[in-house]
Amino acid sequence: MKKTLIIGVTGGSASGKTSVSHAILETFSNERIAMIEHDSYYKDQSHLTFEERTKTNYDHPLAFDTDYLIAQLKELQYGRAVDIPIYDYAKHTRSQETYRQEPVDVLIVEGILVLEDERLRDLMDIKIFVDTDDDVRIIRRIRRDIEERGRTLDSVITQYLDAVKPMYHQFIEPTKRYADVIIPEGVSNTVGVDIITTKIASILND
């Protein structure tokens, strides 16, 4: 059985990781390809009150159930389907619903800390860091969290200053050294994206 090609895509919050991932998905739309988000593996917090959940540092490695992600990636590599958890951003906890992911030839694993855990890195064939200016990222995050995740402006800014920014410099930015490719400015860097897709095509055609 052909080994699943696993691509890790990381970078700071609102850096353009998802856009880069979607560009790869679109390029190889004729292949068996899928994307899994690390955010889906935030730990279940249903045992906590809503107020307690809002105080969780979601940009810290301990907020994620990375063991679960690794286990499911290995299942997919062995050709077995898995049920991916769904995270409810409005309720700040894991939803009771899941979605079925069948084995694929190419799997993109996207998230702010996917290069932080060595065990996760070891599963990846290509590791990408999307490098975008802090000011651009905070503006994007404010728009996204208010429009798509039902957040207030004050809560977004408070979370950014208290957790997102310090965690980026402590945990996320240092993982840049593990990346095979660093893409400044995300999907607008068409040359960088083309280099990635060319490499993926080369591996698939071997």
UniProtKB/Swiss-Prot annotation:
GO MF, one annotated term: uridine kinase activity
Enzyme class name: transferase
Annotated EC: 2.7.1.48
Pathway(s) this gene product operates in, as recorded in its UniProt entry: Pyrimidine metabolism; CTP biosynthesis via salvage pathway; CTP from cytidine: step 1/3; Pyrimidine metabolism; UMP biosynthesis via salvage pathway; UMP from uridine: step 1/1
Ligand binding (ATP): 11-18
Reaction equation(s) it catalyzes: uridine + ATP = UMP + ADP + H(+); cytidine + ATP = CMP + ADP + H(+)
Protein name (database record): Uridine kinase
Annotated organism of origin: Lactococcus lactis subsp. lactis (strain IL1403)
Gene assigned in the entry: udk
